[in-house]
Structures are given as structure tokens and as C-alpha cells.
């Protein structure tokens, strides 16, 4: 990797020219195809040229149309990674060869020149001018020297920064080639660099680099050398002016899902504004990516936290890959701000963010747009468009997708760059220019403002929807609102005026002017408008003729109008009479016998106005016409006036208020009309005074029969004569004789017997008035009362009850009556209801209920009620079936009566209707479809079976108001919780122009409104329709091969099972769906020539049809290739057959030879299998014998167990508090004045100060668990001086901790993880309090320990791994058949020949094990800590023939350098030691030879470790009993099938049972003692502890079960488990790996006894739980009983508690080390002083006690000056 930073000699401005729009809209996509793979591209600063670097070539394109400007070839060149840049110096026999040039760096220099660095010549660079002519060519290595290596670069402040990861070590350059190197623009000389160690170079892959504020950042992914470790994403940072990279720092970036799943693989990253946006995936091949947004402020703070953590002396620098991993120095008193550049670390605090959105695609690049949108390029030729959520600025939501490129460009979106209102997209073999937004598709301001595209805004000057960069004026946030029509909206011809538009939110003209256009813009005149705050005003043009046209308001640079209105130009001269002139809508005036828009002189104040006629005139009559008129006094009586009607003229006589015209013959033009109107003009000479309309009528057209004629108004003078109605009849109406009445028809024909039916009777001459027929109508003998009457031809009446059928009889007339009788009969019937379905429905109503009955179509009125509410009838299918829609119900489960009303009949259904719960929708899967719909989706919810049908649709908005934008798709209800639906089709009129939308879903389920709009909760993604390319001619296909179909958008919203492909009428089953490809497996033989329905088609070939959803696509005809081979291939086949025969003969010979070899190998394997069987049989027999004989310890061995002696209490406290630390000396104590310690100790007397220390540690997430444990030990050690005060502090802290845990809903985790300072303090305090009361339990534990030790030593123990034949831990079970025997040897201790010790050992024991046993046997009466270490003596074998032989683990003759690893440790059998041999102990003498023999070559002392029974031998270098390269399957991975293991590891599991049976009694005794089964009293502190937990559980409302978990965790998990796993705390015994394994099993068993959950045991359960499962089942109830006994025991009195605390105070007074602990605690407080001071100041109580000031006095005491804070950082010049 290489970081380069260099100052240019000639500083030039780096400001880019303002982006120019390359071309106007209208072109959706432009593509440049490259012959070679494109490495990178960049745009020139003037935005006119695009430079593209492909393999061996650089090309410049015109930005307007992507046409080629210039092109230059840069490769291939003669190069080799094993040669120098000039190729003159190569390593050994290497020579330069033809090598392709891959461009790694492509940058525009400040001078405008093009910088290109390739993968050849060690990554050197060249510069080109704008015409791609070579300017300079340097040899300095800059870029990565491999095509596959990563290189990122940027130019910042005239400096080039490069990060590169070379993959080839080249001797031709500096072997310490930095990963980053910045060159001067002229000579490319590097200035500063930081290096990666060679071991780490291949781990880093650089993704991008960017700058923010005064920092430079590089994003890299790190793949650990160990495959078990996860891939991480590192953010590297250093200051811009940091030439020595002192500020070089790293943090880890993590992106996690909602379930806290970590997505480790970074796929793309981009930085914009104050956000760092990155895309991650769960695996490199995952098709789902999660996008996380990191705040740059959080990035800065995370770097600062890590730097500050190192500043306080915590942890190390952790930059081992660049050679910086020293320990951090504590300099907390030195200030450090967030922008500091004086320290760099690779801290352990990572930056974690949760995923903001999941993208269902493999994201390969990201691009941010104006901090409004984010574009994600994918590997499948798509750009996913995302926008920031309006409610949450850190949340993203998808609003569209774009297909990019074509088949020739490749499918992966490598890089995206904004280019004006377009995107430049780099694909593997092409550059694509695509529109940035969809704004051009929105034509109105309102549509633009509500667009889902966040980049779209309304540009007022151009009146178009566009992006902000394309608008020359201000963007509109509020659309203009036009208030009414323009004023005026009409003008007179030949006049001009100012027209005003009342428009709100109209911005003032800036950079443009407003114009008014009269008529269409292409054929219109325009005038400049004047803008005011209230609107716009325009002067109008002169118009010469009346017309109506459109007036538009536009801007001078717009093509679209702001508003359009109809505008009228009128001409008053068109009105010929005074009255029409004065009454016109245009305000015309009558001036001097003509109409004008305005009068120069006084206009007429009144006009003659003829009033409409009140009485019409009969057509064909000749009579005078009298008309009323107004303002007749204005007429000149001397002038002759006359009337003119239909061309006939008659003189007119003018009265004061009327006009009488002479007789005129009035003839109608069309006598078929009953009424007509003709104009009548009053003339004065040739001048028309006024015009009135005269109404004419025709009697024959007004009445067709006698009764109607005689019923006409007497004023019409119509009479009946000559069988017609006429005004010429001279007979009176009284003497007229009419025809008899007649009934033509009636309806309905039947009705209920209860009556009430309204019958309408139609006929002729049914009376002249209602009185002629009132009370004279009978229907089948029942009276019928009139409800409606029309003269002569219609009577409506309501019939009374009836029981039979009969005609309708009507008597017409008063004096003399005529009777009319119908020919058809009316029937009285009985209406009945048999059943109804369904009889249940949702509470919201709308259920379509069908009623079945008889005579349901009878009667005139029918209605249905459900529960007393109307059930609107939908339709009546017949006399037996009707349907209605139920109303909403009042309550769920209520039964409602169903009643049918037919006129006066009322019928109730026997079964009631039941209202049930409304259906609800919970989820839909899948939530994606295409525009044509028809995809099957599953809908889950509840109460679906309460409705009979459901239909699915999409709506425009999740909130009202909204509209349905799709058709209604049917659903199939399967049960109450599941139904399947077809996705709906988007309506063509509503089809959005964007290719992708997310629309809310709604369902039509009766009248249930809750599912009509599911809102934002459930939205369906609508994608473009999948399309398939038709065949070009007939498609030829091999039947046995899969059929591959090409198309677009195939898998966006469809799965393989959504496609139905037919070849003819046979199915072709889909096996794979890609975005552009569909693969199916079809019939092997060619089907019949049909379509998918089996309909025959023309020709011999079947039709290929694809059905997906509602889409049906015919792709064309397909023809299967003929299976008969063509004749021209016969010779080829013959040759192939001959070649096959020869090949078979050769193969047979080879097979015969191989068969002989396999038989030999088989016999060998058979022999190995027999050996394996013998070994297994032998092991089983031995295991059976051990199980039957070794069930208890022998009496002899039992007698060897000595009485236990607990270590003294001070030593126990020291072991408990400082088991993992060494507090024997503290450098800080020597530097700390006693007065300072006294002042600090005084501070500890304030509870608030201690509580603040604990709070500071608990709230600091950077403090590790081990640091918290150390802090707890320091506090306990210091507080032990006053044990009562210590107890009070611990109890108060515990109470507060319990309350916080309950409040945080973590009550069940109390004492479980012990990651809290409070819990650690409490466990240590509890152990100290109970130590003196644990003598019975410790006795049982000691016997158990000795029993386990004896059982383990009975068999072989591996000195390297600690595996033992006899153990109760499966992990440390020796899975080998080790042949050994017991030897009795004699030991002469240290030249005491007269005293010998007898010892039993194993012949397989290593020498270090023998020494340990010798020391234990000789010094068995001496405590272990006082015995000599095995490094202090040697053993010599007394041999008369060979002399004394010194025993060592490794022979002095064979060293590590001479032996093949691993080396076997020597055993007693290797030295030939026999039974009865004598060994002598001698003092160890350290010489060079003995040092070498002691395995010092391994880098560490083996003997000191073995002295503690802790094998330190590396299993890769040494082995004892188990050789890693041979043996069982556990230790060896077979390299060939012929290798058979010597035995099966699982056979040895029976040894666990042997060991368990031996020590089972001791385990039970120990567990029973912990449970106090044999004791009636308990330690007072235990009762005190349990009572505290009971009280706090009651106060905080915690259940009894959780409280018991607290007790079990505190008593067993935190105290007893610590004792069991660490016997060195209480006994003076050695440490042993094999014993640790045994004790871990005992500890696990003890925890299981106190577990409250019943474990589920099986074959896969851990052996530690299976071994003692029965014991655990017996003892678990006793643990609950223990808690009950303690709880029910008498409460602990204050006096008893005080006595106990006094005794404890006396015990702890003998403990030492509190001064050292006080000094270390002061050092910790000093390192966290700022945080503690802030907490003290924020607390009112501690502030009143002046604790912040007191602490400040202590912290400001001067200490000796340490080294410089950055002394651990190595600078690289």
C-alpha cells in the first residue's frame, strides 16, 4: 500500500469550471462502446471533454454526443515485475515481455494536463496534454504494479494522495516501496509516505479516498491472514499537512441489520456533506445489500475517543501493520481536542450504525446528488434511486430504478459521476450518459411538487419541472394560484384596455419578463406585462372583429403558459333593436337608432319592450293579436306602425300599454308540433322597433282522444268533433260524446294477499278528471284507491286485501258511467321466504345476501331489513331469488332478524343474520408486481372468511385524499387467515412515467373501510412489465438442451414459478430467471403445431408462448433439430467410431493395470481395518474391565489424602483481589507524596465520591472487563480498612444497581455476566465475608480435588496437551491407546544415600512429569509453595554398566535443527528405566549445553511452566503421547483414501464413565455441602445477602423466580464457581491443565444444580451435563429448598450482624497492600479526572460537599515529567 503526498512546484488553482449542460433534454440515454475493458474515466475541468482509460488506450470524447475526439495507444509494452522501470536491470534470468497496460490513476492536474499511472514499469506515471500528446514520462513508482491490485487517488490542495496495494514484490525498485507516494507535477518526486509491513500488504484493498475539513480519509477493507477472522472495513485518517503521518489513525466501520447481524463486506462508499454512506453485504456473492449512513461528526468523535483512550494510558497504539504497536503512555493532564494532529492510533472502539435500507440487488457503486438523493449502481445493469425520508434525515427510501446500458456495455455499474443534469456511468465496456431525473415528465407545477423524485423542482422562469442546476432563476416552493378570470374578460372591437390577472405566489421577474399572448402562441400577438405584488397587468391589442379566443400569461423564456383564459371581443353594432341592445351582457347602449358600446351623447333611457303573450293562438286561425308593451309613450304617434309575422303585414294600433295588430292568417310550418313560436316585429316605417315571440298551438297535437281533448283549458277553445280535437268545433263540451273507456295494460300483474300493491293502469278515455273514476276501481273484486291520476290515459291506485284472481274494472263518468274491464287478470299471491345465504358477514356491512322464496317479484314495492336497518336490494333475479347488501351492525356476534316487506306483507326469515369481526390484513408476500398485474401473492390476516369475496387494488396515496389507480383484481379466500390474490393492473390513464413506484394497497371486502387503504404499513413495489424478445424467424432448438429466452426486467417482480412457458401445448418448466434471461426445461421431442390452448396453427412448428401474470407473449415458432444425422456427417462419425475403438483398447490396458494396483491397495486396507478392529475390541474390553473394577478409590489411595489446610486469610484476600495482577510494587507510589495519598483517602470517606467513581467506570464503554475487575479490587482493598463502611458502600451500590437493572429491563441478567464494577465488588466482598464459614465445604472440596488428582494420575497424561486417560472432561480425554506399565523406582534425595523414597510412575511419563512426581513424593510433608521447583534439581539414573545418566526431555545429541518437527519428548521407557531402578536428585547446574537442552530455542522457559503443571510446549514443535501427524481421526486429516486411523476416538468415551464412577461419591459430598444439606445453620452473611435481595425484589416489583436467579447467580456463579475453578485461591496446590478440565466439569455440574430450567438432554448434549445428569436431577429441587430454608429462617438481628462485621474487621486488619492499592486507585482517578469532575459538578449533593474542588487539588499536584506523549510513535521520513 502506498500513501503519497507532494506539494507541486508551480501552484495552480484547482477550482473547476462551472458545469455546463452537455445537451438539452429529449435524449434519454447515450452510449459509447469500448473495444477493451475500461479502467477509469474523468471529465475535464471545462466539462467539454471526457477522458477514458481502457486497456492499452486512452480516449477523449466530446461531452455533448460521446463522439471520439482523440485517441492514443499506451500499450502493450515490454515490462516485467522482476525488472526495473527502464527494463535494463532484471533479477536472475527474467526478461521483459509484452504486458498490457492497466490504468490505475487518472487525474486532471491543476494545469489542465492529464496524469496517467499504469500497472507497468513499477506503477510509474505519464502526463498528456488535452490532445493526448505525451508530455512527460517518469520512472518513480506511484501506482500498484498489478492489474488486480487496488489503487485510489485524489488531488487535494495541489497535492496528490494515492493509496495502493501492490501484489507483486519487485526487486527492481526499493524493497521498502511505500503503499503511498505523492509526486511533484514536474518531476514526480515523492515527499512523504507510510509503509505497510510486507506481511500485511495483501490484506488491504483500498476502495476510495476523500477529504473532509482538514483531514484526508481512505476507506479500505482488510482480509485477515487467518481465515477464521472476519473481513473488516477500516477508515484511515491523517491530517492534510502531516508530512510524517504522526496523525495516521484507523477505526473500524460496522454496518448492522435490525437483528444486529453484522454485514462485513463493503461493496461501495461515497462521502457527501456531513455524511459517509456505504453499502455492505453479508457475503461477497450476496444479492442483497444494506446501506448505512455514518455521520462525519460521529466519525470525528470516534477517532477522538480512540486517541483520548490512548492518551489516558489505556491499551496500545494497535498499528502493528505499519510498525506502531507500543503501549500508550498516560498523559491525561495534557489537553487534546477533536482536531488534534499530534497522535495517531488504531483504537478498538469501532463506529457502528444500523442499516437505513436494504437494497435487493448487488450494489457496486454509489453517487450522492445534492444531498437529496442517492444513486446505487448494481451488478445487473440497474441504478437504484433512493431519497432521504422527510421524517428522518438519516433514513432512505427507494423511489425508482433505471435500466442502464445495453448488452455490449456489460452489466456492472463500476462508477457514476454527475455531469450537469446527466449521469456519466462507467460500465466494463462502455460509458453511458443517462438523464439524472424524471423531471421532464411532469408538465404542471403541482405534479412537479408532488413528484416522488426529490431532484425535481418547479423552475418558474421556464415554467418547467427541472433540477435546481438547470433553472436560471429562483425555484418555486409554492405554485402560482390564479384567482378568477382576468379583468376585464371581454372588450369591444376597435378598443384597447389594460387586462389584469389576479395571481397569488407569483414571483417578481428576475432575468425574464412576463408577456401576455392573445390567441395561440404561433399565431398571436404579445404584449409585455407589468408585475405587481397582487398580480399581472397587460395592455390589450386592437381587435377589428368580434370573436372568442385564448389569452395566455407566459414568461419571455418559457414555452408553457402560467395561466390560460377565454377572452371575448364583442360588437354592439350587431344588435338591431333597442331592447336587445340595452339588455345585452356586454353593457351596450342605444344611441340614435343604433347600438354602441358607448354613446358620445346621451343614450336612450328607455326602450319599447313587447311583453310575452299570455294566451297562445291556434294555428290556422285568423284573428287580431293584442300584445302588451312597455314604454310605448316613447313612440312617435305620427309615424305609421304595423305588425309583421311570417311575412304577413297588418296595421298596428298603439295604445298606452298595448299594441293591437290587425287580423292575420297564422299558419304553422309544422303542424305535428303541439306548440310553436314565431317572431312578430313592430315596425315604424322600415325601422324595427322591437321583436316579440308569438306562441301558436294545435288542438289535435295537444290531445289524441276525446277525454284528453275535453280536459284541455277552456282558453284554448278545443273541442272534440269528427273524431279529433280541434279549435273549429262548434259543439260545446257538455254535449260532446266520447268513445267508451279502454284498458290497454296494467302493472304489476300480481301482489300479496295482504294488499297494499300500487297498480298502474294504462288506457284511453279513462275520464276527464279524477272525480270521474274515484271509488269506481276494483281489482279482482277488491277496492283500489287512487294515488295518482293522468287525464284519460293512466290511473295508479293501491289495492286492498284480496284472495283470488280477477280482472281490473273501472267505471268512468258521473251521471252516466261507462265501464272498462281488463283482458288480463290480476292475481293475489302469498309471498314466502325459505332460506338465505350467507347468514353472516362483517360488522361493517356490505355482505351480499341472497334470499330464496316464492312470489318475490310480485307487488309494487319490496324492501328488506336486517336488524331493523334497510338492506338495499341489489337485484331481483326471478320470483324466487333476490339479493341485497347488508347494513353495518352495532356489535360483533349480535344476531339480526332478516325481514322482507312486499307492500303490506311482512315475512321474517327463520334464521337470523350474524355480525362477525371485520377482516384485517397483516402482511402480503411478495410485495412486488409489474404494471400489467396478474402475479399471485399470498395475503395473511384474520377473519377473511367473514366475507364472500375480496378484490385487491392499488391507490395513489397512503393518506386521504386518494384515488384508485388500478383495476380490481380478484382474490381467492382459502381460510380465515390466508387468501391468494392476483396483483392488479395499473390503469393506463394513471400510469406513472417513472419506471418504478411504491403504491399503497387496498382491498374491497364488502363495506370494510379499514382495509381500503393499508397506508405506509404495506406498500407494493410496481416495476416495469417483463418483456421477452420475439424470435427472429424460426428458432432452432436441441430438445435435450434448456431453452434460453432473452428479455428485460424479467426478475424484478417475478419468480420462476410465476412464468408459464408453453412449447405448443406442452409446458417448459422454468429453472432460472435473471434480469435479462429466462431458462426453462422443455419437452424432449417437438410437440404438435399448436398454441398453448391446443388450437392448431398453420405450419409444422409449435408456437412458443410465455404467460406471466396477465401478460401473454407469443415469441414465435420453434423447430427441433432432426435427430437423424445428415449424410455429410457420416464420414466424420465413422472416424469418431474408429478413434473410439482405439481409445477403448488403450483404456482396457490401463484399466487392467490399475485394477492390479487397486487389488494390492485393497489388501493393504483390509489389513489396516483388521488392526483397527483389534484395537477397538481391545479398548472395549479394557473399558468394560475398568467399569467393573475401578468404581471407588482404593483404601490405600484414600489413606494418602491428608487433611486439608486452608491458606491464611490475608493470603486468601491477596489471591482473591490480585490473582491476575502484580501489586507488589507500584511506580506511582514512589512518585506520590504521602500528603496527596492522605487527601485522596479523605475523599474516599464521602460515599458520593465512591459512587461517582463507579458511575464513571460504568458509563465509559471503552473500559474493558479486566479494567473493571482491577478497579473493583482497588476499591475493595482500600475500603477494607473500615469493613463496616465497606459493607455499607457495597450494599448501597448493590441496591442502586438492582434498581437500574430493573428499570433497563435487564433484571434477569443480574450477577450472570458480571460485567459491572458493582457486581465485581460485591462478589469479592461476599467471598471475603463467607471465607471463615466455609470450612465444611472446603473439606469436601479438598477431598474431591485429591480424588480427581489421584484418578488422573492413575493413567497416562500428555505433558504437551494435558490430555489424560482418566478424566471427567471430554475435551481433555486422551483418545489414544497408550501402552504403558507401572514402575516402582527408588529416589535418593540430594546425596542422602541412606534415605530413599519409593515412587510409582508410568513408563510413558515424560521427564518433566517424573520430576513433578519426585518432588511431590519427597516433599509431601512440605507445602507446595515451599517445595523446590523442578528447574532447581536434576535426576540421574544410577546404572552400573553405563554410569550415571542425566534425564532430560530432549536428547542433547538431537537438537531442533537436526530433527523434523514435531519432536517427541523422551519418556522413562525411552531411557530404558526398569522396575526397581534408582534415581538420584542433584542440584541443577546451568551451562550453555544445559541451556540448549532445556529447549530455550523455543523462546521461553519450559521448566518453570512445567513446574506449575502448565504445559508450555508448542504442539506444532513437540509432542508427548499424541503425534499430530498420525494416530486417530481427531489429530490427522487423511491425505489419501488408503489411510485408515489406528482407532476411533469415540471408543474412548467410556473412560469418562470410569472416572465418573470413581469420584462420584466425592462430587456428591461436595455438592451436598454447598447446599447445606447436613447443616441446620447458615452463615449470617448469607442470610443477610438473601434478605437484601428479597427486599429489593419486593421494592422493584420483581418476581420470585427472578429473585431466586439472583441468589443462585450471586452465591454459586460469582463465588463458588470461582473457588472451584481456582483451587489456588484457598489451597496451596499446583496448577494443572488436566485438573482445570476436571474442575470445570464439577463447576458446570454445580451450576446445573442451581439452574431453574429443565435441560433437554440428548446425544448431542455436552458430556459434562450427561455424566452427572441424574445427580443434577436429584439435587436441583434441593437448591430451591435451600433458598426457602434461608428465607424462612429467623431474621438476622442487628446485634448479630454487628458482631459478624466486627469479627470480619478484625480478620481483614491483618491484610496488607492497601497503600499500594490507594496509590493505584489515585492513578486511575487521575487518568479519568475530567469525567469524574464533570459528574461531581453535575450532582447537587457532591457539589455542596465541595468534592470537585477537593479532587482538583489532588489532581493538580505536580508529578515528575514523563517522556513525550508521542514518544512511542516512529516517524518515517
Curated annotation (Swiss-Prot):
It is found in: Cell membrane. Residues 20-1130 are extracellular. Residues 1-19 form the signal peptide. One of its GO terms (cellular component) is semaphorin receptor complex. It holds the Pfam family TIG. The keyword Nucleus does not apply. Keywords: Cell membrane, Coiled coil, Developmental protein, Differentiation, Disulfide bond, Glycoprotein, Membrane, Neurogenesis, Receptor, Repeat, Signal, Transmembrane, Transmembrane helix. Gene3D superfamilies: GTPase Activation - p120gap, domain 1, Immunoglobulins, YVTN repeat-like/Quinoprotein amine dehydrogenase. Interacts with mab-20. Belongs to the plexin family. This is Plexin-2. It comes from Caenorhabditis briggsae. The gene is plx-2.
